[in-house]
């Protein structure tokens, strides 16, 4: 229900402005943290094929060319010409103490953990994108509020100066108005600096400069209590799923280490040819071949304590991961409770600050009216204007905090991944596709073409140094050419 509501909300766009959905589509396609994690999963997929290769037949060929330098005794008539030899050997592992079986299971389980980690990274990156989007909206609103405040204060100072000239007000009133105007300009400069920082973060996370941003869609209904949020998070959080699968894989590693104390058995088949290229006086043929077949067993008797050390090491590593499971569970519980509390507090702050803004608007209107008839002082009007500005800023901030905390709660509950958000700006990344391609590969010469860099760069041509320290091998067409204040289009996900 939560996922369906969130998908429907994100699909509702606003004409003429970038939407949160478009920002998330761009993030999904081009964020380097996310695209890098996909490559990490591809590397993990390959470990399954590596583990399986240890249990497959191995064929090798040998070729040799030798010349006899000295002969004595019975070999005097053997000839000194070059001798060529060639052979083909086939070795088939029959029993390896369960090492291959457990290695494959460990690799497969780590692939499952890698997929869960990819989901966790998706949720974390989307949460960063939502935070960056909401920060820009908040800071733009705060800058606008401060700009309006500076205009009002400048008008107040002008009016106060005029009234001072005719003797209606004192120099103190003018000084107070001047001081409050300079304070307003200081607050405006601070707000503009925060906006620039937020826009830079937006560009870093989402991949292009922010344009006009539409208000975000409403969040879906969230859990009614902290306990419900924790319960959902413990069942679906991808970080917890990933570490749990890693703990299972560590158990298979212990079995692999134990296999080092067991015998191994292999079947061998060989064909060998030897030929003498020179003349010989011996009454024997100068060439021949041989075919061999048999079993090769290796029975470890003493290995200097190596198997026991490996077992202890793998058991300790398993214990470490099991402890991490508990630590991750604690973090998930804390994250769910913290996000729920932050969301609840922000919602209450929205209600309180909405009332405060309305009350401060009435108070300011009353102060101005009373000051015009001499029952209020200039400083009281200035204070009323500052209190209104403060309450407006707090309201804008609370709205941002509520939305980000709500999305963070969705992320902790495992409901902020690409499939949950319905991002159809292109085909979603299929983690099973690469696994099917590589996990059962038998071909020694099979390889994939080099993967081009998918993530977009955010360096504009004007910012590029003459001798850059890092020159990644990427398609220059994927460099976002827009300057920081210009919006670039949303890049579609890679095909």
Protein language model regions, located:
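A contiguous binding-surface segment within folded domains or other stable secondary-structure elements
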Residues: 271, 277-279, 329-390
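Small/polar-residue-enriched beta-strand and adjacent coil segments characteristic
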Residues: 19, 58-121, 239-328, 335, ...
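Short N-terminal segments immediately surrounding and downstream of signal-peptide cleavage
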Residues: 18-36
């Amino acid at each position: 229900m939560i996922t369906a509501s969130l998908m429907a909300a994100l699909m509702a766009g606003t004409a003429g402005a970038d939407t949160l959905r478009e920002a998330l589509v761009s993030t999904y396609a081009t964020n380097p943290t996310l695209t890098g994690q996909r490559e990490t999963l591809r590397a993990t997929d390959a470990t399954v094929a590596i583990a399986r290769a240890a249990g497959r037949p191995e064929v090798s060929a040998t070729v040799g060319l030798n010349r006899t330098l000295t002969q004595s005794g019975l070999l005097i008539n053997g000839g000194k010409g070059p001798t060529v030899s060639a052979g083909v050997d086939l070795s088939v592992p029959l029993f390896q103490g369960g090492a291959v079986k457990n290695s494959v299971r460990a690799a497969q389980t780590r692939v499952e953990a890698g997929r869960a980690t990819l989901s966790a990274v998706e949720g974390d990156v989307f949460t960063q994108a939502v935070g960056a989007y909401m920060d820009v909206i908040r800071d733009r609103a705060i800058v606008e509020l401060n700009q309006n405040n500076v205009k009002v204060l400048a008008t107040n100072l002008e009016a106060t100066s005029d009234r001072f000239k005719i003797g209606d007000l004192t120099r103190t009133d003018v000084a107070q108005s001047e001081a409050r105007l300079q304070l307003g300009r200081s607050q405006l400069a601070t707000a503009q600096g925060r906006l620039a920082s937020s826009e830079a973060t937006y560009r870093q996370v989402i991949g292009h400069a922010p344009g006009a941003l539409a208000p975000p869609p409403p969040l879906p209904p969230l859990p009614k209590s902290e306990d419900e949020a924790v319960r959902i998070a413990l069942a679906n959080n991808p970080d917890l799923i990933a570490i749990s699968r890693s703990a299972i894989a560590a158990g298979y590693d212990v079995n692999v280490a134990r296999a080092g104390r067991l015998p191994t058995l292999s079947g061998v088949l060989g064909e060998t040819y030897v030929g003498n290229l020179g003349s010989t006086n011996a009454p024997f043929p100068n060439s021949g071949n041989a075919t061999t077949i048999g079993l090769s067993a290796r029975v470890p008797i003493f290995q200097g304590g190596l198997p026991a050390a490996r077992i202890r090491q793998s058991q300790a590593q398993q214990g470490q991961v099991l402890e991490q499971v508990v630590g991750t569970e604690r973090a998930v519980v804390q994250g769910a409770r913290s996000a729920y509390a932050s969301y609840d507090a922000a919602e209450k702050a929205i209600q309180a600050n909405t009332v405060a803004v309305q009350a401060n608007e009435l108070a300011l209107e009353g102060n101005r009216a009373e000051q015009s008839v001499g029952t209020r002082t200039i400083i009281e009007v200035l204070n009323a204007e500052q209190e209104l500005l403060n309450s407006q800023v707090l309201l804008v901030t609370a709205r941002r905090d509520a939305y980000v905390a709500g999305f963070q709660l969705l992320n902790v509950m495992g409901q902020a991944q690409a499939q949950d958000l319905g991002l159809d700006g292109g085909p979603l990344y299929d983690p099973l596709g690469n696994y099917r391609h590589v996990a059962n590969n038998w071909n020694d010469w099979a390889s994939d073409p080099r993967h081009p860099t998918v993530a977009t760069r955010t360096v504009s041509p004007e910012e590029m140094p003459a001798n850059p320290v890092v020159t990644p091998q990427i398609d220059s067409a994927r460099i976002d050419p827009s300057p920081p204040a210009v919006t670039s289009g949303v890049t579609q996900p890679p095909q």
